[in-house]
């Protein structure tokens, strides 16, 4: 297992997430959990949904094994890039011209005036999807060369752009802040592209793309493109479970009290921090390695990486899950309770965060096990598993929101995460999973979790008493 690469990727993601949390702290101070914060989060939700399931998720996991196996890498890469970019730009133009229908789709529970106020923000923010697709395409080429640092660090550029906008417009009215943030998103995405282009040139990968553009005999890669699409289309569903679930939750939250969309956003941001630093960083590094190993028939080597990564993620994610549940109030207080973000809003966000954290371990381990399905071209199986999880999550949301409000939506997502994990493990191999957990490490893990939970419980009592007096 490439621990150095995992550490580098994790550090880059950590830096990006820390700047993201700082951005969210400023955003909470400037907008609180208000009408305008809800409107910006709705507008920013759609490009982020497509980014995660379309650009970063399904595209990467279909493109990498196809690119590894391709005999005409430059031609294949440029053909896929141009097709996707033209498609995404067409959608962006359509949404720019007709933003209100798509905004209504995301916020069914809002009145016509609120939809009208949010629609221009939706039109601006959606162009970020085009920018981030270019970033994702370039990042996948860099992953092929085992370079992860640029991609991991580049998200900080988006955050820094938004932080600059918040500093400049902090004292302005909420409407001006929301518009400033929307334009800052596009500036940040452009900066991410620039950073990746510099690195692509450094690794001389630009020659592959230029060669592919000049050669352009697409008939040589027709079969490769068909194979890519056969992986990509199921991959959209396979990667979409948490994202579509969160998207549905956002829609359902518009039927709840004002601030519910913001509570979900702030809590999910904290939840995403350990998921990204630990699980996504590890899976990102392992994916090209596992793809190459399986492509070369080295199955045992691939599963050896799985064994090592499983215990690394289980210990780290388990500790983060307990910390997020037991220290939720101090965490939310430290990050968000200032300015227009009140103590009441803190307590509402705390419960949502705790419900999200219940799903941290299964979602993280699902990232690890599912990469074996994608690397071995079993995208349809992954899509079927994701569908089971999505149905469970959405149906649970419809029930739990009646009794628990926004926290019920978060809990439903966690339930879907456990379903995703169990079915993914079964598909990868129940016997292999049993062999992994039969290790003596299981006893150490149980002892560690119990001891750590007791320690955190008493730490939380002391910290809450200190901050609340």
Predicted regions and their residues:
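Membrane-embedded alpha-helical bundles of multi-pass transporters/translocases
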Residues: 1-469
């Amino acid at each position: 297992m490439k621990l150095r690469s995992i550490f580098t990727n994790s550090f880059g993601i950590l830096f990006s997430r820390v700047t993201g949390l700082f951005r969210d702290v400023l955003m909470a101070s400037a907008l609180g959990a208000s009408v305008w914060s809800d409107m910006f989060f709705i507008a920013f939700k759609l490009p982020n949904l497509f980014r995660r399931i379309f650009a970063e998720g399904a595209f990467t996991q279909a493109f990498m094994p196809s690119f590894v196996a391709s005999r005409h890498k430059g031609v294949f890469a440029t053909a896929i890039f141009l097709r996707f970019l033209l498609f995404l730009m067409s959608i962006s133009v359509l949404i720019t011209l007709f933003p209100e229908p798509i905004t209504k789709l995301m916020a069914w529970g809002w009145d016509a005036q609120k939809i009208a106020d949010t629609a221009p923000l939706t039109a601006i923010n959606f162009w970020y999807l085009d920018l981030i697709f270019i970033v994702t395409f370039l990042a996948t080429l860099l992953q092929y060369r085992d370079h992860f640092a640029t991609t991991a660090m580049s998200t900080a550029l988006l955050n820094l752009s938004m932080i600059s906008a918040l500093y400049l417009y902090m004292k302005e009215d909420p409407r001006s802040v929301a518009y400033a943030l929307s334009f800052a998103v596009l500036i940040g995405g452009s900066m991410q592209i620039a950073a990746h282009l510099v690195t692509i040139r450094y690794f001389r990968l630009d020659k592959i793309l230029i060669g592919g553009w000049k050669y352009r005999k697409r008939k040589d890669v027709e079969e490769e493109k068909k194979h890519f699409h056969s992986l990509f289309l199921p991959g959209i569903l396979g990667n979409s479970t948490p994202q579509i679930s969160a998207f549905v939750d956002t829609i359902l939250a518009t039927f709840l009290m004002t601030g519910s969309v913001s509570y979900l956003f702030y809590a999910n941001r904290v939840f995403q921090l350990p998921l990204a630093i630990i699980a996504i960083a590890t899976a990102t590094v392992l994916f090209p390695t596992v793809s190459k190993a399986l492509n070369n028939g080295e199955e045992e080597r691939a599963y050896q990486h799985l064994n090592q990564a499983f215990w690394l993620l289980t210990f780290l994610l388990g500790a983060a899950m307990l910390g997020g549940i037991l220290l939720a109030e101090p965490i939310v207080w430290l990050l968000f309770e200032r300015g227009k973000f009140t103590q009441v809003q803190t307590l509402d966000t705390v419960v949502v965060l705790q419900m999200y954290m219940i799903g941290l371990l299964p979602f993280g381990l699902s990232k690890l096990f599912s990469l074996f399905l994608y690397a071995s071209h079993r995208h349809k199986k992954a899509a079927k598993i994701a569908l089971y999880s999505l149905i469970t999550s959405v149906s649970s949301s419809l029930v739990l929101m009646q009794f628990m409000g926004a926290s019920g939506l978060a809990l439903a997502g966690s339930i879907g995460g456990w379903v995703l994990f169990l079915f993914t493990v079964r598909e990868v191999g129940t016997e292999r999973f049993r062999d992994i957990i039969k290790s003596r490490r299981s006893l150490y893990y149980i002892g560690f979790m119990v001891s750590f939970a007791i320690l955190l419980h008493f730490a939380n009592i002391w910290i809450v008493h200190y901050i609340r007096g």
